[in-house]
């Protein structure tokens, strides 16, 4: 036995067609759209936004990470040369250096400083602090096995 087929309800086509065909009337007192754009351009500029304030220590940690990622020399060349010459003058009377010596010494010193500051930062984070302090330096030195001054 076949089921009787249900037919879709008849829509009132006259009402739907009339709704679609009605023209939309624009009010006559409104200005054209182009004039609105010109008025927007003539407005005075908005006040500049204040820079966003980050929580304390956020910028410091960002700078530490940026410096750790970089591979540019952090110690200026001239002051480093002067310091090495002063230290060498304390031990030797007449001492001369090749140019490569300063480059090699500078790389070794920077590497040692970066490693030491990394250890100091780990000590600071372990103590649940963001700012590194003198006691972090002392703890890092103690953990490294160097005698305390």
From Swiss-Prot:
Q: Which SMART domains match?
A: H3 (SM00428)
User: Which residue stretches does the UniProt record annotate as biased composition, category Low complexity?
Assistant: 33-44
Task: Cite the residue spans of the region called Disordered.
Answer: 1-58
Encoding gene per record: gH3
Job of this protein? Core component of nucleosome. Nucleosomes wrap and compact DNA into chromatin, limiting DNA accessibility to the cellular machineries which require DNA as a template. Histones thereby play a central role in transcription regulation, DNA repair, DNA replication and chromosomal stability. DNA accessibility is regulated via a complex set of post-translational modifications of histones, also called histone code, and nucleosome remodeling.
UniProt keyword list: Chromosome, DNA-binding, Nucleosome core, Nucleus
Tissue specificity statement from the Swiss-Prot or TrEMBL entry: Pollen specific.
Q: What is this protein called?
A: Histone H3-like 1
Matches recorded under PANTHER family:
HISTONE H3-LIKE CENTROMERIC PROTEIN A, HISTONE H3.2
Q: Name one GO molecular function term.
A: protein heterodimerization activity
Task: Note the Pfam families from the entry.
Answer: Histone
Q: Name the major location.
A: nucleus
Record localization: Nucleus; Chromosome
What's a single GO CC term here? Answer: nucleosome
Q: According to the UniProt entry, which residue ranges have a biased composition of type Basic and acidic residues?
A: 1-19
On subunit structure and binding partners, the annotation says: The nucleosome is a histone octamer containing two molecules each of H2A, H2B, H3 and H4 assembled in one H3-H4 heterotetramer and two H2A-H2B heterodimers. The octamer wraps approximately 147 bp of DNA.
Protein family (similarity comment): Belongs to the histone H3 family.
Top-rank taxon of the source lineage equals Eukaryota
């Amino acid at each position: 036995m076949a089921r009787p087929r249900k037919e879709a309800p008849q829509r009132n086509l006259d009402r739907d067609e009339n709704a679609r065909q009605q023209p939309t009337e624009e009010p006559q007192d409104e200005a054209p759209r182009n004039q609105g754009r010109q008025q927007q351009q003539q407005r005075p500029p908005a006040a500049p936004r204040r820079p966003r304030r980050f929580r304390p220590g956020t910028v410091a940690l960002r700078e530490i990470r940026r410096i750790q990622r970089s591979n540019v020399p952090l110690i200026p060349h001239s002051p480093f040369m002067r310091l090495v010459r002063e230290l060498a003058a304390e031990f030797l009377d007449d001492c001369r250096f090749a140019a490569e010596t300063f480059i090699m010494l500078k790389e070794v010193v920077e590497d040692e400083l970066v490693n030491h500051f990394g250890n100091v930062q780990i000590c600071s984070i372990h103590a649940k602090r963001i700012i590194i302090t003198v006691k972090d330096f002392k703890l890092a030195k103690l953990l490294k096995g160097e005698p305390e001054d």
